[in-house]
């Protein structure tokens, strides 16, 4: 297993831009190794929701921090964005903050793309995955600094060059919820991203073996891939608060089909708020005892995931960071 890293998920759907930057600065002060941000044009819920622009956030946090790694988890470089422009943006940030910037990518959700003008039926997974692979190929070509004539099925460049590129380009982390994309992440990604709370068999029997298989086919060691998981955790010494804090994130407990097909935050919110708190909390590690919390986190480490990014659902993120630094971080680092 690679070196253990502990990261913080900056929830752009829950906090405005200034507060979200301040929270990330706090995360570095509390010893976190990374901070990743979601990239939403629209939030999961209408009331109380936010959606600051992820790239502006990354640039602002980079200017106010010195050490913490920064990235998206995740951005879709294939619909409302042109991948060539995303390549330029991340190259610039990579020059500004050398060795600290990563690009986490995924296949996309209708919630963010339909509102910005995508026309027609939301594409099936096969097309979304094909677009992602093509976008990754194009971005990597542009990060060489060479002139790129690219004539793909979805994207095209003519004599395109990015003039300011960090040495080695920008690490790409590929998000996967199933073995097909996980295999691709093992073959082509610098990192792999998944999310917790979906049954350990998914990670032990499907995702991690697929990452290893993809790496082997590419002649790579799986240890060369940063294996990141967003751990949904509601930890608080007050057990009632730990449970209640999950309510804001009820949309995560909708079915995958609902999350990928609903295009309106108002509709998403209505569907999510109809769920009972017990169902909402199932996606989360809800704990008030630190040893019990770590006991539920440890299986992900045992499965081979080395970069744990913690997503806390409560509105008081400073409280979570204080408790995490005091109660959980020492126990987790002792495991490694």
UniProtKB/Swiss-Prot annotation:
InterPro entries: F420-dep_G6P_DH, F420-G6PD/mer, F420_G6P_DH-rel, Luciferase-like_dom, Luciferase-like_sf. GO terms for biological process: carbohydrate metabolic process. Coenzyme F420-(gamma-Glu)n binds at residues 39, 76, 107-108, 112, 177-178, 180-181. One of its GO terms (molecular function) is glucose-6-phosphate dehydrogenase (coenzyme F420) activity. Pfam families: Bac_luciferase. The keyword Oxidoreductase applies. Substrate binds at residues 195, 198, 259, 283. Its EC number is 1.1.98.2. Transmembrane segments: none annotated. It catalyses: oxidized coenzyme F420-(gamma-L-Glu)(n) + D-glucose 6-phosphate + H(+) = 6-phospho-D-glucono-1,5-lactone + reduced coenzyme F420-(gamma-L-Glu)(n). Catalyzes the coenzyme F420-dependent oxidation of glucose 6-phosphate (G6P) to 6-phosphogluconolactone. This is F420-dependent glucose-6-phosphate dehydrogenase. It comes from Nocardia farcinica (strain IFM 10152). The lineage of its organism: Bacteria, Bacillati, Actinomycetota, Actinomycetes, Mycobacteriales.
């Amino acid at each position: 297993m690679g070196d253990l890293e502990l990261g913080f998920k900056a929830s752009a759907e829950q906090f405005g831009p200034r507060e979200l930057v301040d929270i990330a600065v706090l995360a570095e002060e509390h010893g976190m190794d990374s901070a990743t941000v979601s990239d939403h044009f629209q939030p999961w819920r209408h009331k109380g929701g936010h959606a600051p622009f992820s790239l502006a956030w990354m640039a602002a946090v980079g200017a106010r921090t010195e050490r913490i790694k920064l990235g998206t988890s995740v951005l879709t470089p294939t619909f409302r964005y042109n991948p060539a422009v995303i390549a330029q943006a991340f190259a610039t940030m990579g020059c500004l903050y050398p060795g600290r910037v990563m690009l986490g990518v995924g296949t996309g959700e209708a919630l963010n793309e339909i509102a910005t003008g995508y026309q027609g039926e939301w594409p099936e997974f096969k097309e979304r995955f094909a677009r992602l692979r093509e976008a990754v190929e194009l971005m990597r070509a542009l990060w060489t600094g060479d002139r790129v004539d690219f004539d793909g099925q979805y994207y095209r460049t003519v004599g395109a060059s990015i003039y300011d590129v960090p040495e080695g380009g920008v690490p790409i982390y590929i998000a996967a919820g199933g073995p097909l994309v996980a295999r691709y992440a093992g073959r082509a990604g610098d990192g792999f991203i998944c999310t917790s709370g979906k049954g350990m068999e998914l990670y032990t029997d499907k995702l991690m073996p697929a990452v290893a298989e993809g790496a082997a086919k590419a002649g790579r060691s799986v240890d060369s891939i940063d294996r990141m998981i967003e751990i949904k955790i509601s930890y608080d010494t007050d057990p009632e608060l730990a449970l209640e804090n999950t309510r804001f994130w009820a949309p995560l407990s909708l079915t995958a089909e609902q999350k990928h097909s609903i295009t309106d935050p108002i509709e998403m919110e209505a569907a999510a708020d109809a769920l009972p708190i017990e169902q909402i909390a199932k996606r989360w590690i809800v704990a008030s005892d630190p040893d019990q919390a770590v006991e539920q986190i440890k299986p992900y480490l045992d499965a081979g995931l080395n970069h744990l990014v913690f997503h806390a659902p409560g509105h008081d993120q400073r409280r979570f960071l204080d408790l995490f630094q005091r109660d959980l971080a020492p126990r987790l680092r002792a495991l490694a």
